[in-house]
Amino acid sequence: KQMPEWTAKRNANMARIQAVFEHSPYFTVPKPSSDYVHAAYKCYVQVNVDALPECWSRDRIMAEISAQAVPCFSGSCSEVYLEKAFDETPWRPKTRLANAKALGESSLMFLVHPTLSEHSLQKTVDAIQSVIAKIHA
């Protein structure tokens, strides 16, 4: 019963976070096609690592946002095949998958669940804005 409402709320939360990143050359905001409704269980943004000033990295951005008591994570398990469980199995590729590696090294993930308060969401937006301002300084 509540899935449509929750999905709409997650998408609205994701849109607010994405809007903060959209105009910075240091980030890529993936936008799904309008042909379907994104489930938006998490909000992912890619850091354009090569565009960052020398003293900045994805990990520093993550640490700076987290230091403001805002949950910010490295994202998905893009190369799960590197886990020990895949040792000695036919499911590990012979060479690392280039796109999976790049996404794993550049992703930032933010929470967008429908129970986030307006205060929490605004705190997230404010933290991201302050870190982007530091990068641009």
Predicted regions and their residues:
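PLP-dependent aminotransferase class I/II
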Residues: K1-A137
